[in-house]
Amino acid sequence: YEILRCLVGSEMCIRDSAGAVDSVRIRGGKIHVHVIGNSSGKISPKGICGSGIVDLIAELFLEGWIDIRGKFSPEKTNLIQKREGQLCIEYAPGLYFYQKDIDEFILTKAAAHIMVEIMLRESGLELNQADRFYVAGSFGKYVSVESAITIGMYPDMEREKMINAGNSSLEGAQKLLLNKELLADIDQILEEMTYIQFAEVDDFLEQMVAAQALPHTDYKKYPTVMEKLKKRQNICFY
């Protein structure tokens, strides 16, 4: 998920540093943001980072400001406007998230979704048979699990099974440097590993298209998201 730390193509996307919007909520028709390093209230938002993007798209979807394809519904709010020939939303003063940004992000979240789905299928497992769902990398440390599930980036499963592994590659390298006996564990892991070449999966493109809907074309995979939609809007998109 490191690719999601900063969405390629978004003019306003920045790294998770001071001034970055890292959390978004929509309440009462207004967008509320949290800005990194703004405990004093003196730092203005400069852009949005990966976790903020996940929140923003999830909230736009739950409010009905974007549809299941991620397309803006300008009739729902005057915060959606047209700039430079395309629709966008002003999520903070002078900061805009464009339709092209949403479109590009949806491709990324779809790829993340089908990686999990195909790995489970090729391993002969159902989602409810998975004991743990580990999210590695610094992005996973800060992203909202609920928002990631809402947009279909993570599977809709028991929240207590979802574990933030942090920077597992760095931590693993440090442990190996301090204890060479762990090399034996690596050999065992390699023997048990299931290797999948996604490009060779017969229905890869079909699965990719299905995962480009919010949260997914098969909405039955996301029962908790459907409940959220009903509570926020008293309707279901499907």
Regions found by a protein language model. Give the residues of each.
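Generic, well-ordered alpha-helical scaffold segments in large soluble proteins
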Residues: 56-64, 115-122, 133, 142, ...
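Short beta-alpha connecting loops at secondary-structure transitions
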Residues: 10-11, 35-44, 97-101, 151-163
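Single conserved hydrophobic/aromatic residue that forms the stacking wall/gate
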Residues: 1-9, 14
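Gly/charged contiguous loops adjacent to phosphate- or pyrophosphate-bearing nucleotide/cofactor binding elements
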Residues: 55-108
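A short helix-loop
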Residues: 15-77, 186-199
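Phosphate/ATP-binding catalytic cores across multiple sugar-kinase/actin-like superfamilies
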Residues: 106-128
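Catalytic phosphate/nucleotide-handling subdomain of diverse soluble enzymes
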Residues: 125-189
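Acidic, glycine/GT-rich loop-and beta-edge segments that sit at the periphery of enzyme/chaperone cores
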Residues: 175-238
